[in-house]
Amino acid sequence: MSSTRLETLALCLQNVLADKLANVDQQLDQLIITVSPVNLLPVMSVLRDHPELGFEMLIDLCGVDYSIYGVEPTSEQGREGKRFAVVYHLLSIRHNRRVRVKAFPEDDEFPVVVSVIDIWPSANWFEREAFDLYGIVFTGHPDLRRILTDYGFIGNPFRKDFPLSGNVEMRYDPDQQRVVYQPVTIEPRQITPRVIREEHYGDSE
């Protein structure tokens, strides 16, 4: 969206949602609003139902693990040191615009947010995926179980503290004539330190 349209949408959101917004930001031609988990459900309902907003479609939902992210959190980002986020991408077909919504669960050890499945049924499998990969619990979800990993899988593979080699590996056992699980035999690998460059690195070259 153009900067003018983004500013118009930002002003509309601030007028309609007022103190329910923790933060409003623009990044890469995208409007991002941060919402407290306590206000998530009422905010999402307004985003869908208000005639000036009309975000009738949830096109994506994902989890984020910000631990060892490499960038210090600031109050302006609305994160303030919290580890996990749930990110929602909404589309208004009527007004031809998008908005990104972030909610940061309060408890890093047991991240919980309310399910938005009653507002957008498409959230069903999205929330199951975030639960499976990040361990984020969505209260009110009618069938919150793993969707990508095995039923007996241990841990959440998209968390930053999950080992790259996993916890177990599979092999065929000729004596038992079946596939069996065993502890991983891969040796730890040397990981190259992450390099975070400045935002406009290389622009002058």
Curated annotation (Swiss-Prot):
Q: Which UniProt keywords apply?
A: Cell inner membrane, Cell membrane, Membrane, NAD, Quinone, Translocase, Transport, Ubiquinone
Query: What exactly does this protein do?
Result: NDH-1 shuttles electrons from NADH, via FMN and iron-sulfur (Fe-S) centers, to quinones in the respiratory chain. The immediate electron acceptor for the enzyme in this species is believed to be ubiquinone. Couples the redox reaction to proton translocation (for every two electrons transferred, four hydrogen ions are translocated across the cytoplasmic membrane), and thus conserves the redox energy in a proton gradient.
Q: Does the keyword Cell membrane apply?
A: yes
Q: Which reaction does it catalyse?
A: a quinone + NADH + 5 H(+)(in) = a quinol + NAD(+) + 4 H(+)(out)
Identification of the protein by name = NADH-quinone oxidoreductase subunit C
EC numbers listed for it are: 7.1.1.-
- Report membrane topology: Peripheral membrane protein
Q: Where in the cell is it found?
A: Cell inner membrane
Q: Does the keyword NAD apply?
A: yes
Record GO terms (molecular function)? NADH dehydrogenase (ubiquinone) activity; NADH:ubiquinone reductase (non-electrogenic) activity; quinone binding
Which organism encodes this protein? Nitrosospira multiformis (strain ATCC 25196 / NCIMB 11849 / C 71)
Task: Name the GO cellular-component terms.
Answer: plasma membrane
Q: How does it assemble?
A: NDH-1 is composed of 14 different subunits. Subunits NuoB, C, D, E, F, and G constitute the peripheral sector of the complex.
Return the PANTHER family for the record.
NADH DEHYDROGENASE [UBIQUINONE] IRON-SULFUR PROTEIN 3, MITOCHONDRIAL, NADH DEHYDROGENASE UBIQUINONE IRON-SULFUR PROTEIN 3
Family per record: Belongs to the complex I 30 kDa subunit family.
